[in-house]
Amino acid sequence: MTILFLTMVISYFGCMKAAPMKEANARGQGSLAYPAVRTHGTLESVNGPKAGSRGLTSLADTFEHVIEDLLDEGQKVRPDEENSKDADLYTSRVMLSSQVPLEPPLLFLLEEYKNYLDAANMSMRVRRHSDPARRGELSVCDSISEWVTAADKKTAVDMSGGTVTVLEKVPVSKGQLKQYFYETKCNPMGYTKEGCRGIDKRHWNSQCRTTQSYVRALTMDSKKRIGWRFIRIDTSCVCTLTIKRGR
């Protein structure tokens, strides 16, 4: 399983063209540098004939730098109390690609792999009884996840509460790439559209509600200034409860 996971990570970064981290440190609101740029093809076709030989040796460094960059950005910028009520998370759900991504973001795969390692530390008997499928576990709220483009979003709310235009395409050295956002929201066609699953309706009012997180995206404000900003996108479906009065 470990070898399979490492192969998956290598394959993932094999088709990703990351911007140099030295340039990433110098980006501002008007900068177009961004570390998570993905193209399709070999390392040689993207960066020249010498890139293939040094590509594999730099994968670990690239991955480490991208994670550090995301953590640094999360420490520098914090939403205020009013704006963070329904959008208080920092996630990596944005990808620049020439076509629709075929898999969830890499950090999602890393989380699944971590869960596998945690399960591997338990005995076979414990794992068998802890398997949600064996216990018949169901989610409290039904949700759906999909990649959407800026053409679907059009506008978004930034961390200052202002409305900005989400740019559909991002200029790169060899053309343009589209911005894709991995969104998760409550399923309007699911069985929980009338309330959360497993809640006693005699005592509680329940509702499945889509919540948002901040992600970094290329946008344009009302003054036509283009830059990378944190915007809200749908990232989860949670259950909200209120107690019934008069009982």
Swiss-Prot record:
Q: Please give the GO cellular component terms listed in this UniProt entry.
A: extracellular region
UniProt-annotated location(s): Secreted
Q: In what way is this protein post-translationally modified?
A: Mature BDNF is produced by proteolytic removal of the propeptide, catalyzed by a FURIN family member. In addition, the precursor form is proteolytically cleaved within the propeptide, but this is not an obligatory intermediate for the production of mature BDNF. Can be converted into mature BDNF by plasmin (PLG).
Q: Which UniProt keywords apply?
A: Cleavage on pair of basic residues, Disulfide bond, Glycoprotein, Growth factor, Secreted, Signal
Molecular-function GO terms, alphabetical: growth factor activity
Q: Disulphide bridges in this chain?
A: 141-208, 186-237, 196-239
Prosegment residue ranges: 19-128
Q: Which residues are glycosylated?
A: 121
Q: Which domain of life is it from?
A: Eukaryota
Q: Signal peptide: which range, if any?
A: 1-18
Q: Cite the position(s) of the site with description Cleavage.
A: 57-58
- Subunit structure and binding partners: Monomers and homodimers. Binds to NTRK2/TRKB. Can form heterodimers with other neurotrophin family members, such as NTF3 and NTF4 (in vitro), but the physiological relevance of this is not clear. BDNF precursor form: interacts with the heterodimer formed by NGFR and SORCS2. Mature BDNF has much lower affinity for the heterodimer formed by NGFR and SORCS2.
Q: Tell me, in a sentence or two, what this protein's role is.
A: Important signaling molecule that activates signaling cascades downstream of NTRK2. During development, promotes the survival and differentiation of selected neuronal populations of the peripheral and central nervous systems. Participates in axonal growth, pathfinding and in the modulation of dendritic growth and morphology. Major regulator of synaptic transmission and plasticity at adult synapses in many regions of the CNS.
**What family classification does the UniProt entry report for this protein?**
Belongs to the NGF-beta family.
Q: What is this protein called?
A: Neurotrophic factor BDNF precursor form
The source organism is: Equus caballus (Horse)
